[in-house]
Amino acid sequence: MKFLVTGGTGFIGKRVVAQLLQRNIDVIATDINTDKEKNDFEDYLSTKNVSSKNLELLELDISSKDDLKKIFRNYTITNIIACGYQMSNLIDSNPIKGAEVNIVGMTNLFQAVMDNKIHRMVFPSSQSVYGTTSEIFGNKPIHEDDYCGLQHQLFTYAVMKLLNEFMAQKYVSMHNVSIACTRPSVVFGYGRKRSSLMWAEEFATNPALG
């Protein structure tokens, strides 16, 4: 069993990698620029007391079909956890790059699941796909099967996540592959350095740090 974790040096990705290594699972962690985050990534793993003997850290641009083909040609990958994604602030500053990674890149991974007979792919979508929730739902709880449309969306990020979900459903129904997604809410914790949600990070960590 060997897991490919895209965005593996990122805020969520490195936590996923650590948990896999703790279970003695072989991991290929990739990111578009591993040099930039390598020190923080290695420091984080050291705090979790996990061995890196089952880990390979590689550079990968998921928007490049050639890069992906090379990975799957060189390694026997059984599962994919796709954490590599452009956040709202990066999408707004460079929409073309955002679309290349978030739409083309994710679709490349769905295709790779089919082409390489991957056991299962999992990716985080977002609770933001529900749109401006108070306007739509009022104070009632939101359920997983509640409607997610475009007319109440504020963020390109959420619309891209909706498209990812739609494409994943197409691959599942048309090609009988196993792709699952989650819809996490705001993800915060120590170590986040850049995000449009830094307010959540500061709200949680500043009181603890004094």
Task: Place the predicted regions along the sequence by residue.
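N-terminal Rossmann NAD(P)H-binding glycine-rich loop of SDR-like oxidoreductase domains
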Residues: 3-23
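SDR active-site strand-loop-helix element
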Residues: 6, 30, 80-86, 121-127, ...
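Conserved glycine-rich Rossmann-like NAD(P)H-binding loop of the short-chain dehydrogenase/reductase
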Residues: 25-37
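Rossmann-fold cofactor-recognition segment
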Residues: 48-64
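NAD(P)H-binding glycine-rich loop region in Rossmannoid oxidoreductase-like domains
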Residues: 62-101
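Conserved Rossmann-fold NAD(P)-dependent oxidoreductase catalytic core, especially the SDR/UDP-sugar
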Residues: 107-155
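NAD(P)-dependent short-chain dehydrogenase/reductase
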Residues: 135-137, 166-210
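Active-site helix of classical SDR
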Residues: 156, 160
